[in-house]
Amino acid sequence: MSDPSAEPLDPSIRQAIVPDNAAGRRFDAVLAELFPEFSRSRLSEWIKSGDALLDGEMARPRDTLRGGESVQVQVVLETQTHAAPQDIPLSVLYEDEQVLVIDKPAGLVVHPGAGNPDRTLVNALLFRDPALASVPRAGVVHRLDKDTSGVMVVARTVQAQTALVEQLSAREVHRQYLAVVVGALVSGGTANAPIDRHPRDRLKMAVRDDGRDAVTHYRLRERFRAHTALECRLETGRTHQIRVHMAHLKSPIVGDPLYGGALKLPKGATDELVHELRTFKRQALHAETLEFLHPVSGEPVRASAPVPADLQRLMTVLREDSARAAELARR
């Protein structure tokens, strides 16, 4: 166990003594037990870089321990010092000392990058909680596309981040989305198709045989005349996954600028619906529900983000168009 009294004054240096009952075990495995707040991959990197020392000397991850050795770890974390805190309003659904759950609006980019140097979610997070500057990626453990709205969880400590990333990797985080797609689907199903970069367009992803496995479960929420509202549950979390899978199934998401294709107007659509479909300028996709285990207590946490006004409006107009068409058919 770690001995708090032996901690050096520098908070970035962590120390511990290898317990006697760890004799015969690998250095990397024991290190992961001594410092569970860090991921195994990160600890392994520190061993290889010399930032994790055994009796003051470099060691290998596979080295066998005797018990009683001293361990010193120089905590080296990438930070977000290049991102400036900016006062951008955030809708908080849940928060405590370990996690922050927010409702991201459409139009907000998660990370600064080319074309979006600031005014991002990371800038907003650093303003709300400056301590996130010491957490890798400002605590972001998963992303939503710029024009996808909805619920996201942010880790406020390295320990929470490690636990949440492990849950995501183990597919233990439940993520449900609302999507409005082109076409009147008759049933739900599962899209099980690998995804990788598009071979020609580097801005896009595509279903590819040599891609990474990707699984999306979907079921009908509401069926309109020529569109369908779906509940989509992610089993994996590939870039643009739901958007790519729906386009692959020939039912692209309404308004999707990358995968939607040419605008398709239902025959006899009302003027209101024509206007709504032509002016809906983002993918009709909303991260509605997120469920995970609290990284410290282990208790289940469930957060839901209300359907935003633009998506509610789209569904209302689709509903009214369907009702009008049904009424005309009865005459």
Swiss-Prot record:
Ranges of residues in domain S4 RNA-binding: 25-97
Active-site feature positions: 145
Signal peptide: none
Enzyme class, broadest EC rank: isomerase
Keywords from the UniProt entry: Cytoplasm, Isomerase, RNA-binding, rRNA processing
Annotated GO MF terms: 23S rRNA pseudouridine(1911/1915/1917) synthase activity; RNA binding
Tree of life domain: Bacteria
Cytoplasm in keyword set: yes
GO BP, sorted A to Z: enzyme-directed rRNA pseudouridine synthesis
Pfam families listed in its UniProt record: PseudoU_synth_2
Localization per record: Cytoplasm
EC number: 5.4.99.23
GO CC annotation terms, alphabetical: cytoplasm
Family indicated by similarity: Belongs to the pseudouridine synthase RluA family.
PANTHER family: MITOCHONDRIAL RNA PSEUDOURIDINE SYNTHASE (PTHR21600), RIBOSOMAL LARGE SUBUNIT PSEUDOURIDINE SYNTHASE D (PTHR21600:SF44)
Function: Responsible for synthesis of pseudouridine from uracil at positions 1911, 1915 and 1917 in 23S ribosomal RNA.
Protein name according to UniProt: Ribosomal large subunit pseudouridine synthase D
Provenance organism: Xanthomonas axonopodis pv. citri (strain 306)
